[in-house]
Regions:
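A composition-driven surface/loop motif
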Residues: 1-136
């Protein structure tokens, strides 16, 4: 699976309520998260490094401008938006290759009933199942 899929699944499973699942299914989720954790944590550390290294010198000023957005002139808003967009593009470009890496993780699949129960218990839309597809 691609790292981007793993990270999304890891986060979704971490946020998911699973009180209505059978005990054996909850154990599958816990074991899946355990197998995914090293990859997800390594990516989070990588992302933080990238975000830190690409911060422009005036990043604190940019963040301050965001906080006082209503008080900014149109020119200041444009400049702030431009600076944030440039920063975000650099970060996105830097992490894209990392997210597209294929990682090998073995996880036990949940049964179909568990997918339905997770969906209903968490009030998720059907498309949320795409994020946890790797264990379905």
């Amino acid at each position: 699976m691609k790292l981007v899929e793993l990270v999304a699944c890891y986060k979704a499973l971490g946020e998911a309520k699973v009180t209505k699942l059978e005990e054996s299914e909850v154990i599958k989720i816990v074991k899946a998260r355990k197998a995914m954790r090293p990859f997800a944590e390594e990516y989070d550390a990588f992302l933080k490094d990238v975000q830190e290294k690409f911060k422009p010198e005036n990043f604190d000023e940019i963040q301050s401008n965001v906080q006082k957005w209503k008080d900014l002139s149109d020119e200041e808003k444009i400049a702030t938006n431009k600076a944030l967009a440039e920063y975000q593009k650099k970060v996105n470009d830097a992490v894209e290759a990392e997210l597209n890496k294929v990682v090998e993780v073995s996880v036990e699949k949940l049964n179909e009933n568990s997918a339905t129960k997770i969906l209903l218990e968490n009030g998720w839309e059907l498309k949320k199942l795409d994020e946890i597809e790797v264990i379905l």
